[in-house]
Amino acid sequence: MGSGGVIHCRCAKCFCYPSKRRIRRRPRNLTILNLPEDALFHILKWLSVGDILAVRAVHSHLKYLVDNHASVWACASFQELWPSPGNLKLFERAAEKGNFEAAVKLGIAYLYNEGLSVSDEARAEVNGLRASRYFSLAERLNVGAAPFIWLFIRPPWSVSGSCCKAVVHESLRAECQLQKTHRASILHCLGRVLSLFEDEEKQKQARKLFEESANQGCLTSSYLLWESDRRMDMLDPGRCLHSFRKLRDFAAKGCWEAQLSLAKACAHGHQLGLEAKASSEIVCQLFQASHAVNKQRVFSVQKGLNDTMRYILIDWLVEVATMKDFSSLCLHLTVECVDRYLRRRLVPRYRLQLLGIACMVICTRFISKEILTIREAVWLTDNTYKYEDLVRMMGEVVSALDGKIRVPTVVDYKDVLLTLVPMAPRTQHLCSFLCELSLLHTSLAAYAPAHLAAAALLLARLTHGQTQPWTTQLWDLTGFSCEDLIPCVLSLHQKCFHDDAPKDYRQVSLTAVKQRFEDKRYEEISLEEVLSYGQLCAALGVKQESLEPAPFLSAGDIHAFLSSPSARRTKRKRENSLQEDRGSFVTTPTAELSSQEETLLGSFLDWSLDYCSGYEGDQESEGEKEGDVTAPSGVLDVTVVYLSPEEHCCQESSDEEACPEEACGAQDTQALVPGHQALRTPGPEPPLCSRWGLGKDVTTSGYSSVNSASPTDSGRTSGGPPRSTSELPTGSSLNTQPCHHHARKSCLQCRPPSPPESCAPQQQVKRKNLSAHSEEEEEDMNLGFLKL
């Protein structure tokens, strides 16, 4: 009963139960650990080994995945990490799990005794056996590329004592005799090594190894055997036809060299039973299978790199190739390797020259008989880098490129065209000149290599006033009409002849390609008069548009790069000198010797520059006899001559005193150069986790190194933001009119007089370099290969 005598019922109006409180459940926190294992594997793949160790320490489940799944280690990145006693277990584990990069770096580290210290006693034998193990593993993991490990153990070998290269070769041979599978590529590598000896017995052994390798399915060995038998097969019509059928089979399976040979063989298609149309279709398929690769992506990956820096690097590589007389193919392959590496991995500016010379060392070993030795390559950089720096960069390049050294280049397609359509020698030289000029400009890479080669040929024929610059035969062979080539021809002409070449910090234009083709064997084709832009447009039948030269960065906008200052340089003038002052216009500077310097050096410099080349200078992996370190010693003496007594006394001596070690029965004397060490900016070190530690590799090479003694020019500052010089010319939007096939007159330009020949060539010596040298591809590198 309520108040006032009112009786309340228990209805909803009179009585209210307390409302129930609903408790909200907290949402479940999802973490990376809740992802399926397949998703976790995709996350862990391609991480650096330091990141993998850091993730491993986070949770027991992640630790279980890292420790028990080989795919994590097979894809781990060892970029900028070199084997050392502190991280050896990590490299070994990754290599055994199928990591190509770890296997390559371990093989090179043991072969050159770099980073992994081994006692002097039986060093070559121990290192050779270990290197052969990891080289064999790397070759098995090498999928889709030609066998490559032979380039590290190719001759020369030491003639006395134990040689690490020879130990690797014998160990691999013993392995092939024991194993019945996975031997084809190893047998090919063994055959390539023996084929480089001039001994007739070794040549026979090499052929036997190639035959065994071909029987086990090695396509490269099959092609080499075909090439060696080609001359004999051509004498018999029946054998010739059978040989051609084998070549077509090799080309259909993807052998690039076989595809090139097949296209060139179509020049004699009637002898092979081929009609003209069938021959043209084979060549046309090769050209149409070529695709462009966007080299502008280099600058999106390399934030500190611009087109001028790349131009300077390539110009210097051209100069080295000219000095060493390397082929155009070797030069083009070197540049391709540089660009492919720059698209995949970040490179500081001070290591660009190291990257370039490392790529040249690799490419000369892969395709040339005369090679660039490691010690000579170090000397060519003015000792900016040490011996071990170059060895490690070679490992970085080969692993980053997955062992794929040989790729299609512009010069390959150019050679096919010049074989199929005979032309005057000067037209051939001009076409080659244009192809090498195209290496300097990344904007021209917007065109496929085959397209660029065809455009270079068309421009060469136009320049030489051909009645029909682009014949129906050339159209049928390439699949490109004259109208298809017009944009590329105009771009090529603008970049090669209209735009100004960049200058170094000495205000000297970089013209190494032009100097290369001023040689008499090229009939001094680079001195020839060229068509003006207006004459070219008239010859092509297109509307002329005004063009402005694309400015390159000036010396005030960029640090000194791959060049040395001309200050404190002595020069001796001679009458009838072929090069009055080579140091004033070359990218890798030289200084002529004064009378005092010539007296000090005598004939030592001539011997050092001439002898240390090719096979006889390639003792870098085994050590050289005392006195065999040639060019760096000459640089040392002249550097001291340039210094005043006060400067000389104040300089610090190198930390690395001469400590000769025996390897392959020979000894090295380390070049001790007084001066400041070039600065190195170490990258961030990966974290240390669990029982594995990465650690910083403080171990130097077991072989004596050539010291770096280039001081850093840190006082220079960069200017404003660089402007890209790789834009296509405005003439790309064209009024395409029919191409008129009639002769055109050349532009009348002043031709510089030929310099007088020198009866007594000057002695030259390199000056010290006073400046610190400072993505994965979206397409498979086999993209340019013909698929039949």
UniProtKB/Swiss-Prot annotation:
* Localisation: Nucleus; Cytoplasm, Perinuclear region; Cytoplasm, Cytoskeleton, Microtubule organizing center, Centrosome, Centriole
Residues of the region (PEST) are 582-766
Major place of residence: nucleus
Q: What is the protein name for this chain?
A: Cyclin-F
Q: Which organism is it from?
A: Bos taurus
Show the taxonomic lineage: Eukaryota, Metazoa, Chordata, Craniata, Vertebrata
Q: Name one GO cellular component term.
A: nucleus
Residue window of motif D box 4: 351-354
Q: Where is this motif: D box 5?
A: 767-770
